[in-house]
Amino acid sequence: MTSAVLEKTSIHPSAVIHPTAEISEGVIIGPNVVIGEGVKIGKGTRVIANAYIEYAEIGENCTISPFSTIGSEPQDLGYKGEPTKVIIGNETIIKENVTIHRGAACGDFTTRIGNKCLLMVGSHVAHNCVLEDQVILANLVTLGGHVHVGFGAFVGGMSVFHQNIRIGDMAIISGFSASRQDILPYSKGEGRPPVPRGLNVIAMKRRGISQEVRTATNEAFKLLISEEYNTTQAIEKIKAEIPMNEYIEKMIDFIQTSKRGVLLKSHKSGYQSLDEE
């Protein structure tokens, strides 16, 4: 046990806690939990039975479910024990058997998960991933290293994603999907690859985005995925014909800054699916 444990904190006698761990007020630590070196846990967080945590900073009012592992070494052959970590925001829920690996020795050496995220049973977040606020990963989702998942994105169960790709804000991806290219913000996608099937209008409406803005964004989206135009032509047409807004600007910027390419068309128009390799 550690002197950093404050009043009103509950720690089960069978828990093992490293002397340097910083446990805040109101934290509950259940049976057989192991808290290793380099851990900070914020107020009101619950760590339920049999979880394992090391080299991680966890925010306030989070829930860490049984048999989850946070902060273990990255699956990177180049990792040589450098001081890396995981940072998790406030009010995030980590369900059973989730694995979150700490960063590899590149970038900022950190795997980051935002506020109010939900990682469902068995999902895996690899080294140096970034999940922005309110991301949901359904059961058994697997993210390769350095994947960036935007604000409010939802990823369906048993989906897998190549390292270094980006999933845009408020994108929704169906279960059993797989991609090695970036996923456009605000899009609905499914399959291998998850070809865009439409704009995630419901999510935009729930976020309070006006009908006028949703309509303009949808028109821009339809041009981007149209078989009639290549991406450069579609962007030129959008700028010439559609009232610009922050969501259209974000889609265009997302495309223009992509390093792996953005999945916009079906593989009939040139995309090679995973099954065709």
What is the role of each PLM region?
Residues 1-14, 19-20, 25-26, 61, ...:
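Terminal amphipathic alpha-helical/low-complexity segments used for targeting or macromolecular assembly
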Residues 5-6, 10-195:
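Structural signal for interior beta-strand "rungs" in well-ordered beta-sheet cores
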